[in-house]
Structure formats: C-alpha cells, structure tokens
Amino acid sequence: MSVNLSKGQRINLSKEVEGLSKIMVGLGWDAAKQSGGILNHLFGSTSYSIDCDASAITMGNGNKYRACIYYGNLSEDNVYHHGDNLTGDGDGDDEQITVDLAHLSSEIERIVFVVNIYNCTERKQDFGLIKNAYIRLVDESTGKEICKYNLSDDYAGKTAMIFAEVYRNNGEWKFNAIG
C-alpha cells in the first residue's frame, strides 16, 4: 500500500520494501488553465504550454556534487532518465528517472530530484502556472507504488524546485519529501 506523504515527511524505504534494489521515480504536473479574455470565453479556456524538466543530482560524501542526470545526460552513476516531456500533457508521470540502488557507488549518499521550467524567463513562466505536481516512488521489481508526495503549496514566482531526495543513512535508503 502506497504511503501519501506531506511536505517534510520522511520514510525509510528499506523498511517499507525489504530488499528494495531499484526504484522508478515518477514526476508529474499539469499546466493550469488560462482564463479571461473574450476568446477564452467564446472558445473555452486552454492550458499554458509549459516545458518542465526533471533532473536527478547525485551527491557524494559531504554533499559533494557528482553528476546531474537530465534530458541532456540521460544516464550516469546507475541513474537513468527516461527522456524529456516537452508539454506535460496527458495523465500519469510526465518524466521518469530510474535509480539502481543495488549498484550505486558506495560514495553516493543522496540523490536530489529537481524540476525547473525550461526558458522560464523568456516565456515569463513560473510554478504558479503549474497544478497537480507530484513525485512518486515505485518498486521496479513489482511495479507497486511505495510512496507519493503531492506538492500543494503555492509556488508562484519559483522557476526551479527541489521536489524530494533519496538518501543513504546507516546503510538504509530513505525518502524526504521537500517541495
């Protein structure tokens, strides 16, 4: 059974799923509907076209940067990005990142999952135009969702965010819902 998390809540992944070796991190969001204007009134509202990009940043001892896995660098350190979704349209995960926990270097202590809006300044876009944002973790071996964090705060004015992190503590993997 999946655990629904709140901002700042942590869970021990190693205790939730015994023998957990590989996770899929799904990130999703929807563009808010545009409102106002006579054309929107006549023809109905439309969604903004927002290109959000998910990334995973691997950190070593002492929070030292190791690598950034994103649409331009799809795999490194046994972390795999499944590709860029340019619109966020449709149901389900918009971008996915797989982490092979069993084969990560022992030097990696944490993986930070971030999302930014591509060309945000040029397009005058921020997370105030995003709704239904979430991050979820799935056990790759069973396909079962372990946990999910729905980001519900108002993030207007922000163009990049840390959604969550997976980190190693005393040999166990844990998840922290940051948002």
What would you call each of these model-derived segments?
Residues 1-179:
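Intrinsic-disorder/low-complexity signal
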